Amino acid sequence: MLLMLVAGCAAPPLPPKAVFPSNLPNGIVARSIRSDGLNGDFFQRPSRKPQRALIMLGGSEGGKMWSNATNQIVEFVNEGYCVMSLAYFGADGLPNDLRGIPLEYFAKAFHWLSTQENVIPNDYALLGVSRGAELALLLGSRYPEVRTVVAIAPSSVVFPGPPKGLLDALRGQHSAWSFGGKEVTFVPIPFSWTTLRGMITGKRTRMFEKALQKKKAVEAAAIRVENIQGPILFVSFSRDQVWPSTWMSSQMMQRLRDRGFRFHYEHSDYDTTHSNWSFEPCWAKILDFLRGQAS
């Protein structure tokens, strides 16, 4: 039962392994990134014009799930972006589990991009879904190189990572992220019948709502989105069965208003579920938001 405590942080099921695209249109070059401990794929249409990089982050399925999203990659490249699909666990050379992932790993990705020909340095857009959205916002709050964030079904706080097994769960919960060798403060998932029911039924939103009632823990683990150095788009789903992405997005919007955030920010909510991020109205909104920011 305790194993279930934090398993509810999972994103919707997606392909566990990336298949390197072989059906890209002519003119788009794909290459693997395996240097300085990184594991990712990079997509670019060669051009003499400097291009802005978009880093795409998956959720708790691990690996490079965006490398499978050929249609989305092509759309972003056609808008003038170069695209990095970046794994941060669950891939060769990386941790097996979503636990204590060093944020410094992503600084290596920023550095790698800064060394690439015709890539605009230190001006990156991040797009993440579920735990990847939590990560994108967290990185934006700590690294000024992040100048745009698209957060799909995001969390407003840091949550723990799933345990490795029952014995591991009995030892306690651990943050999904670390910085400077220390765990990033997180909101624990309480052990209760609400948690148990959520894990049995698959409807886990109430479980997270209970965790979010702990005001002191929430404030300590809140992502400082007001520190992000550029525009933010929150995309949420009113029938989200994983966690309350609509409520958490609204909380972050209020936080930005209260702190006089000087960049553009908006929240688009859709009457659908956590796993339906690619449906047409949602994806059209994301493209429209990023359009015109590619250079």
PLM regions with names:
Residues 12-52:
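N-terminal cap/lid segment of alpha/beta-hydrolase-fold proteins
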Residues 128-138:
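Glycine-rich nucleophile elbow surrounding the catalytic serine of serine-hydrolase chemistry
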Residues 96, 235, 247-295:
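C-terminal catalytic histidine-bearing segment of alpha/beta-hydrolase fold enzymes
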Residues 97-117:
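Alpha/beta-hydrolase active-site loop
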Residues 228, 234-236, 240:
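Short beta-strand/loop motif that positions the catalytic acidic residue
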Residues 118-130:
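Alpha/beta-hydrolase fold nucleophile elbow
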Residues 49-51, 57-95, 241-245:
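Short substrate-entry loop that stabilizes the transition state in hydrolases
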Residues 141, 148-227, 242, 258:
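Accessory cap/linker subdomain of secreted extracellular hydrolases
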